[in-house]
Amino acid sequence: MAPSKQYSEGGQLQLMDAERIEEEEECFESIDKLISQGINSGDVKKLQDAGIYTCNGLMMHTKKSLTGIKGLSEAKVDKICEAAEKLLSQGFITGSDLLIKRKSVVRITTGSQALDKLLGGGIETLCITEAFGEFRSGKTQLAHTLCVSTQLPIHMHGGNGKVAYIDTEGTFRPERIVPIAERFGMDANAVLDNIIYARAYTYEHQYNLLLGLAAKMAEEPFRLLIVDSVIALFRVDFSGRGELAERQQKLAQMLSRLTKIAEEFNVAVYITNQVIADPGGGMFITDLKKPAGGHVLAHAATIRLMLRKGKGEQRVCKIFDAPNLPEGEAVFQVTSGGIMDAKD
């Protein structure tokens, strides 16, 4: 079927392809479908009040956490989980089946062909991509560009979806979106209307925002979640070695939530991270810095990108860790129109 217009008169994003809509409907099962399996509608409402809107999301919770929901006994939880299992395939599958499932992955262009090539096509859905580096290394500029490119149709290497942006440092600028949208030939106001934004002030606020996001993602076609930066509030709210263990535990819980969102709704999760001094880096290493967050963040992020400054407005991206990408570097440039290929 031929693609339809991307935006309605009201500026809201329209899904471009009818076949794509059918694919998206198969990505997750609504929690309301439990009613057809004999679950009381009141119990389904309790799950929704707790931030659980899909059967996929339900199966990502332990029974212990589900019994913590007011009004749900162990017997009810067992019955609910049994009903959800009937709607989903949660067991082993073959590698061939997984390969077919991986075809649902969408790769969103960064705006730079060189960077896209390095990333195997762009920022992937179904996983967390972390970008770390010093200030002015291009992390937030890449985030702004992705806010626009995500809304491009699939055939233009976009995500054909909306964007959720959690800002912990107050660096998001809507006026920055305007020239980037113009570069891609898109209506700036319509693009901004399809970005939902929240400013987080504590790590608890940051986590609660993620819980509330599930309701929106279950109802609307989101394709990207940005957290800029993921570690900033944890470094402020927890200080000293005495609170390090608790900080890492809370950070792990939040990263687990991000992973579940990525897999539950087939969205790309792009997080930025700060760097800290690495006194044990060695005497032959000139740049003694490493990403903050320790092993907890290192294991949670599927793809880790190290950004650094180059000449002038040029930036260099290096694959720091990725399960499916070879080591390599790409040079890109920060312009008024966002991230682009570097000019010699």
Curated annotation (Swiss-Prot):
This is Meiotic recombination protein DMC1 homolog A. It is found in: Nucleus. Belongs to the RecA family. DMC1 subfamily. Pfam families: Rad51. SsDNA binds at residues 235, 238, 241, 247, 315. Keywords: ATP-binding, Cell cycle, DNA-binding, Meiosis, Nucleotide-binding, Nucleus. Recombinase that may participate in meiotic recombination, specifically in homologous strand assimilation, which is required for the resolution of meiotic double-strand breaks. Exhibits DNA-dependent ATPase activity when bound to single-stranded DNA (ssDNA). Mediates renaturation of homologous complementary strands as well as assimilation of single strands into homologous supercoiled duplexes leading to D-loop formation. Binds circular single-stranded DNA (ssDNA) and circular double-stranded DNA (dsDNA) in vitro. Catalyzes DNA homologous renaturation and DNA strand exchange. InterPro entries: Dmc1, DNA_recomb/repair_Rad51_C, DNA_recomb/repair_RecA-like, DNA_repair_Rad51/TF_NusA_a-hlx, P-loop_NTPase, RecA_ATP-bd, RecA_monomer-monomer_interface. The lineage of its organism: Eukaryota, Viridiplantae, Streptophyta, Embryophyta, Tracheophyta. Plant silencing DMC1A are sterile due to defects in homologous pairing and subsequent chromosome segregation during male meiosis. PANTHER family: MEIOTIC RECOMBINATION PROTEIN DMC1_LIM15 HOMOLOG (PTHR22942:SF30), RECA/RAD51/RADA DNA STRAND-PAIRING FAMILY MEMBER (PTHR22942). DsDNA binds at residues 235, 241, 247. GO terms for cellular component: condensed nuclear chromosome.
